[in-house]
Structure formats: structure tokens, C-alpha cells
Amino acid sequence: MIGALARRLFGSPNDRRIKAYQPRVDAINALEPELVALSDEALRGRTAEFRQQLADGKTLDDILVPAFATVREAAKRTLGQRHFDVQLIGGMVLHEGDIAEMKTGEGKTLVATLAVYLNALAGKGVHVVTVNDYLARRDSAWMGEIYGFLGMTTGVIVHGLDDQQRQAAYACDITYGTNNEYGFDYLRDNMKYRLEDMVQRGHYYAIVDEVDSILIDEARTPLIISGPLDDRSEFYNTIDTFMPSLDKATDYEVDEKQRTVTLTEAGMEHIEVLLRDAGQLKGDSLYDVENVSVVHHVNQALRAHSLFQRDKDYIVRDDEVVIIDEFTGRMMPGRRYSEGLHQALEAKEHVQVQPENQTLASITFQNYFRMYEKLSGMTGTALTEADELFDIYKLEVVEIPTNVQIARLDEDDEVYRTQSEKYAAILAEVERANSRLQPVLVGTASIEKSEVLGEYLKKHGYKQIDFTDPKGMEKLYAAARAGKPAKLFAVLNARFHEQEAYIVAEAGVPGAITIATNMAGRGTDIKLGGSLEMRIQHETVGITDEAEKAAKIELIKADIERFREIVLKAEEVVEVEPAKGNKPAKTLTRPGGLYIMGSERHESRRIDNQLRGRSGRQGDPGRSKFFLSLEDDLMRIFGSDRLDTMLTRLGLKEGEAIIHPWINKALEKAQQKVEARNFDIRKNLLKFDNVQNDQRKEIFDHRISLMKDDSVAETVAGMRHDFIDDIVAKHVPEHAYAEQWDVAGLKEELERVLGLDLPVDEWAKEEGIADEELLTRIEQRVDEHMAAKVGQWGPEVMRYAEKSILLQTLDHLWREHLVMLDHLRNVIGLRGYGQRDPLQEYKSEAFALFEAMITHLREAVTAQLMRVEIVPPEQPQELPPMEGHKFNADTGEDDMAFANVSLAPADNADKTARNPNDPSTWGKVGRNEDCPCGSGKKYKHCHGRYA
């Protein structure tokens, strides 16, 4: 109560912050007449002036006012668009490294140009992040006109570019691209072997469009670059055949709220019998140690069948299982579930089972975007997640006032008993709206629901068309011109991802009915009457005569203006009180414009708000209403029992709905609970991922420093000496008498690992020899051996071999380490049953694994360099330069190391040249020979185990 009074007296913190920007807005406006008078050349020249001012010691804040004024004038001259005052405020929020919440249609794309231009003046590169390739291309070309006019370069990063094209795009002043492309480029860069092959040039400043979608909705999904493991498709198909025979009532239990499934005791026995009959069970029990991986795959198959639904969680396209983003309804080609779940889904759908992958590199969006020196974002809906955005990213959400007041009517939800009653109500409402040519957008939570609704409309006389088909659209236009409903609808979901921009753009045509999966981050405005740009683009194709083209454009403009008037007048007048005597009937007028109908509530209020926000742009009228049933997922899982009881008490008949603000509040509370739970999950995942992230930064930083060094000889020598110290310390304990030394063990290990037969036993017999002296002699002999190699090969070749072996070995061990961390993370939760904190246990064990990896690195690098020999080619030729190599971005394999240089163990010089990192070059290896990988182990105990 006191807080509400204070807000009325002093304004909210958001109001006060907006007010604080006003003096700078006034200053920008005051500069406008001066800039209007400048020539194009003079306006363009201001970029060089600003850069000089920065070089002279001024800060970006010092030049914000003139820089923003310059961008506004450039936008007027290139795009014919002038930034509103509220857009200037949005630009300031972005520059300060916070989130600007701006309603749909308020021009977020144009707002970004202010902060982008100002920060690009620093010359460090600005990254603008979009949710798909279409928007990246569109915005870079569209806003690039402003930047190009002001003398700045713009690049775009989309799927399918090669490294050279990516380098050129990142070298630009401003780079547009998707969150996925930025993240994958970072991972690929840290798998390369030379600095000049890396494409990114740092992480200075990023503006994330649809920031809530990327930093919250996708935060749980890591970006992973992986390589294939052995093919086990038959095993997955065998396990899948067991699933139909399991009984949900007795064999397993499903918890939809927690999205878990567990086998019952009876289910375990049933599976044991099936596995034994199929010859897949080792030992007597399903839970014997040797069956751990079998249990894991059974559980994944069970999850695939009971928790994952086709056309909701994934679709099958071109014989592949493609994941669907649960929040946006978008397909995510290239993304695969890990831990064998994707293979289980492929077996379930009877498509080709792809081999499991080994993680080569991974990072979450949370950790990727936190690398930027400054991060900001834009969205239409972030206030509901403001706490999370600040807690994790230290980003404050600032609500930017609309340029024109929102005129949309948001009506209370209608709640029905069953899905069929709900669909009947939606159909009736669609028919009423269509009869007055009011465009309708029906939002659904999944592809499955959108297609069910589409079939429902077809049964009742509606025809599905493709909004990208000129013939179909002409029918819709003709009906609108005639003032008649066409009864035509289009479906927008992940299946039609490629046409989504055009379908959305035409959803504002009179009489248009669009069924769409979640509209989060679609990025295309729905303009009443239709999209001028889209129609010009499609209807002027093939017209070469300029006069004819201009005439056609004028016709399209007139058409759209007429359509806009029709949509604005599509109001619904409802009689709320009949006429009595001389007293006229009392009516209620509901606005025209775009009518948003939600077919169910999403778990997140933000997604619902995004759907509502498609209507009412720039002060246009509009309506929104949600139609729900007790059979909807949210209602069913999170407390429909109380509502069902309430509806029963009210005596609700079939087909009747309950409409009350209390229902809305109850639903909002349910959504808040789900949001809080999801926030806790993301926060907990981040704590675990931070452990791996710290190690990742350490490894990647070390890798880059190694690539920067011309020679890693000092590093390699240090690793060699540390490794020898460890061996000697193991066999010659400190302060022990010579009689207590394990001389035989020391000699054997030195010979096994280093390939040197040193007279350690003779040295140990010398009178008065100390352990330090023994260590020094061993190090001297080993150093002499390496010096001889330098003399034999030459310093250039030695530098090349050392760096190649060090980087490749580091990469190999890091990949194995990631697998170990994944396994550790999967089981560490069980420590909670022993009253231990799983996070602390994970930190402790992950650190121990990291230390073991570093120790192994020292051993492996030392062993390989001690044993490797260069076999001269048959014909003399110059050593190839280091730049000649090919990088496989999919697997992370790089053939740069050892390119054109044959390497083989010294004691096998007469055999085929062997590359320690490429088993295909080893040929036949005897079981008791040393493993060619250089580990120092016998082949049968090393790679021979997998042969």
C-alpha cells in the first residue's frame, strides 16, 4: 500500500529512469535543424569526426547526442523514417547495456541503429543477434543502408558461409547474425590451429533481438559440436521393439509435471525377460554393472515413447527427426538430443538411426553472451522475466513508452470443459469475425494442435491456402474487395518455416484467417490491410518496364489502403441490454483490427503476451481472447481439479463457458509457479555449467596463447621436466634411503614411456648419490635426446612438430574430458541421497578430473615427442608452409598437423610411416608392441582394446 502511494507521488523507478533521458532527447532534437542543412557528404563526414574525437580522449557518452542526431538524419535520407523520441530513449537504454522492452510495431529494428552506430565508432565490431537467418539478412540489408550512408561496413553471418566469408563479415564495423551462428563460430574458432584461421575478432558489444527468447527460452539448450561414435543403430531398434509391450498401468510411471518416467518393479522384470530373450542382457540382472549402458538406453527409449510427442516436440522431415523449439514452434535443424535420446526417437519413428556423437566442444548461450564486454537486448515482453535477466546477466529491463497509446482490447479468458467444446467456440468466433472481414490469428501451442484446428475448419467449409501462392491470395483479395468472406485460412508452423515471414505479413488482410504456432520472435509486423513490401516483392516479379512497375505499385498501395479501412471498420456491436419501451437497447462496441485468439495458455505468461502483442501495433485497434479447456496441458497438469469442481458447482452445461477475472488470476498464478520452477532449473543448470565454463575458458585461453607463440619449446620442456619429476618422485620418495628406491620400476617406466634405456641402476649404485642428482641426470639425458632431434630435423620442423603435437593432444584430451564431465553430471545427483551437496561434489570431482587431464597431457606430449621421427619423403621437397590445411567444421578434425610430414615411432622406422593421432596410418600392429599413439602402453592395453 505504501509502495503504491509512493509510485503515485514520485513515479515508478522505470518512470524516473525514462524521465532522466529527456534532457538528452531535447538536445538531440535541438540539433535537427543544423543537420538537415548539411549535404550528404558533410553528414557522412561526421563519422570520421566522431572517431577522431574518440581518439582524442572523448568517451562514447560524450558524443552520444550528436551521434544519435546523425543517425536519425541518415535514416530520414535513406529509409524515409525518422526516429521518434521514445525510440531515442530506447537507443540510450541499449547503449547503457540494458534491455529495452518495446511493444510490437514500435520499431525495435530502427532503434538498434542508434546504439549500433555509436558503439561501432570504437572500431571493435558490434554484433546484432537475431533469431533466424531471414531476419539477419533482412535487417543487415535494410539497416545497412543507414550504416553505408554514414561510411560504415555491414556484414551478415548465416548458415552455409565458408571461413573466408565469415572472416570478412566479422571484420565489418557491424555484423548481423543468429545466436546459433555466433556461438558455433566461437566453438569452431577454438578448435583451429592458427590464429589467422579464426573468424571472430573478439566480443565487444552485442545487441540481442528477442532477448528473452534467446537468453531465457534457449538457455537450457547448449550449442554442441560433435563427431560420430560407433554405429549402434541395431541396438536402438531392438530396444525400441520392446516399448509397445510395456503396460503404462503396471510397467512404468509418468510424471508429466516433472517430465520424468520410471520403470516399476514389474517393469524391470518385464524388460529383463525381453532383453534376455533378445540376447542383450549380460549376467543375471538388469542392474549388474555390465548392463549400465543397457539400462540407460531402455530409459531413453521409454522417454521417447512416453514423454515426447510427434508434431509437438519434434517432426519427421526428409527421413530425419527434427527438434521443435517448445517456445517458438520453430524447427531446429542440426540440433540433436544427447545421451542417445535422439537415436531413441529415430528408432521410434522408424527412420534411419544416426550414430551417437561424441562432444568435441560445447557452450550454453548463457555463458557465450556473458563473454561480451557489453550486452544489451530488445524485446516486446521481458518484464515478467526481469528478475532472471538481472540475476544471471545483470541486465535491467526498461519499459519504453509507446509512441501512440495501445488501443487493443484484451478480453477475459473463456474456459470450457472439453477440447471439443473449446474448438466449437473458436470456430463460432472465427465465423463471426470472418463475416465482418476482421482478420483473425489463432495461436496454438504445437504443430499438432495447429493441424487439428486446421482440419476442424476444413470440416466446416473452410479451405486451406498458401499465403505465398499468388492465385490463392488473389481469391482472398477479390473477396475483400467485394466485401464478402472468402472462408480461406493458412497454417503457419515449423513445417512451413521458410514462408513464415510472408504468411505473417499477410495475416492482416481483410478476411484472412491464420493458424500459427507460438509467435515468439517471429520478427515480422502484421500490418492492417497487408504488407506493401511483400506484395510489391511478389506482384512486380517479371515486370521490366519502369512505368508499368510504378503503375502496379500505385494500384497495390490503393488496394492496401482500402483493405486497411475495411479492417478498421470490422467492429463488433453487441447488444448487452435489450430495448425497453422508449429506452433504446444498450450496446457494446468491440474494436476492429487484428483479432488474436489463443487456443490455450502457454506455461510462460511472456509467450501469451507475445501472442497478444501481434495485434494493436502503433495505436491500431485490435482484440485478443484466450479459449481454454480443462483438457489443456497447463490446466490438466497444474490444477484443473479445483476449476472442475468450481464449474460443477456453477452448473455449467455442455458448450457453456465460464468467464471471470478470478479464472485469469488463477491461471496467472499457475503460470508463475511454472516460471519459477523453470527459473530454478535454469539457475541450477548454470551453476553446474559454470564449472565446465571455467575449465573451458582456461583451456581455450591456453590454446590461443600457444597459437600466438612462435615456439612452444619452453612450454614443452617444462611439461617434460614436470613429467620426469612425477616419475622420479613415484619411484624415489623424498628423503628415502637409496636402498628404498624402486630403481627397477623407475628404469622400466622411463623405457616404456620415453623409449630410452638409461643406466639408472648403475647411477643408483654410485656412492652418495642423492635423489636430486638422479633427477638431474635423467633430465639431462632426455634433453640431450630432444636436442639431437632438433639437430637432425632443424629448428623449423621441430617448432612445427612440437606445436602440432601439443595442440592436437590437448584437443583430444579435452574431448575425452568433456565426456567424463557429462557422465559425472548425469550421476552426481545421486549424492544428494547421501546428504551431500551434488554441486559441491561436482565441483570437487570435476577439478580432480581436470588436474588428471593436465597430468595426462604432460605425459602424452612428452611420450609422443620423445618417440616420433620424421621419415624423409622419397623425393626431396621443401617443408610445406603451415597454412596449408583443411578444417572440417562438423567434426572439428583438422589435417594441418603433420600435413605432408610423415611421423613414425623410432623403433619402427622400417615400417609404414605412422601418425600417432591417425590410427588409419598404423597398419598392422603387434599386440605386444608399444601403441603407436605414443602413450607408452602396450598396444593390447591401449588402442588394441578397441581394435
Curated annotation (Swiss-Prot):
UniProt keyword terms in alphabetical order: ATP-binding, Cell inner membrane, Cell membrane, Cytoplasm, Membrane, Metal-binding, Nucleotide-binding, Protein transport, Translocase, Translocation, Transport, Zinc
EC numbers: 7.4.2.8
Residue numbers binding ATP: 87, 105-109, 525
Pfam families: P-loop_SecA, SEC-C, SecA_DEAD, SecA_PP_bind, SecA_SW
Region Disordered, annotated ranges: 905-928
Topology of the protein relative to the lipid bilayer: Peripheral membrane protein
Cofactor: binding comment: May bind 1 zinc ion per subunit.
Cellular localisation: Cell inner membrane; Cytoplasm
InterPro entries: Helicase_ATP-bd, P-loop_NTPase, SEC_C_motif, SecA, SecA_CS, SecA_DEAD, SecA_motor_DEAD, SecA_preprotein_X-link_dom
Molecular function GO terms recorded: ATP binding; metal ion binding; protein-exporting ATPase activity
PROSITE patterns (UniProt xref): SECA, SECA_MOTOR_DEAD
Gene Ontology CC: cell envelope Sec protein transport complex; cytosol; plasma membrane
Recorded catalytic activity of this chain's protein: ATP + H2O + cellular proteinSide 1 = ADP + phosphate + cellular proteinSide 2
GO terms for biological process, alphabetical: intracellular protein transmembrane transport; protein import; protein targeting; protein transport by the Sec complex
Chain sites annotated for binding Zn(2+): 931, 933, 942-943
First-listed, main subcellular location of the protein, grouped into a coarse class: membrane
Superkingdom, taxonomy of origin: Bacteria
CDD domains in UniProt: DEXDc_SecA, SF2_C_secA
Role, per record: Part of the Sec protein translocase complex. Interacts with the SecYEG preprotein conducting channel. Has a central role in coupling the hydrolysis of ATP to the transfer of proteins into and across the cell membrane, serving both as a receptor for the preprotein-SecB complex and as an ATP-driven molecular motor driving the stepwise translocation of polypeptide chains across the membrane.
Summary of subunit composition and partner proteins: Monomer and homodimer. Part of the essential Sec protein translocation apparatus which comprises SecA, SecYEG and auxiliary proteins SecDF-YajC and YidC.
Protein family: Belongs to the SecA family.
Protein name: Protein translocase subunit SecA
Species name: Rhodopseudomonas palustris (strain BisB18)
Designated gene of the protein: secA
